[in-house]
């Protein structure tokens, strides 16, 4: 009887723990979707609609990345890095004031880079950065 009770209690504890971690998964899914929508600017010839993208930008980023700058972003990235060939999800980091989602990407001119997306507590995109990775030379 005691063994059955212990097994039952352990099962309930495991179910409760699974529920506690579910929020992180939902946040990650939403933030990945926002990041992938934003990265469409690097994939496609025709830009995604700015009004759709701007729905998920924080107030500060909406000011810093207006519609004209958004249009210029594609040209600037293509000039500096080339055309985006591949993007793979790399990491999800949770912080007190927001989250960070990172992708390993490959461009024509820059074979290995990272695109980092920073989100606030409300899952609005606060900032992004494209960081080229260089091989260490001996």
Protein language model features and the residues they cover:
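Short, low-complexity N-terminal intrinsically disordered segments enriched in polar/charged residues
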Residues: 17-44
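Acidic, low-complexity intrinsically disordered segments
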Residues: 41-44, 83, 134-138
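Positively charged n-region of N-terminal signal peptides that target proteins for export
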Residues: 1-4
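Short beta-strand edge/turn micro-motifs at domain boundaries
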Residues: 112-138
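Short solvent-exposed beta->alpha transition segments
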Residues: 51-90
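Surface-exposed, charged secondary-structure patches
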Residues: 75-116
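Bacterial N-terminal signal peptides
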Residues: 7-17
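Conserved short acidic donor-positioning loop in nucleotide-sugar-dependent glycosyltransferases
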Residues: 48
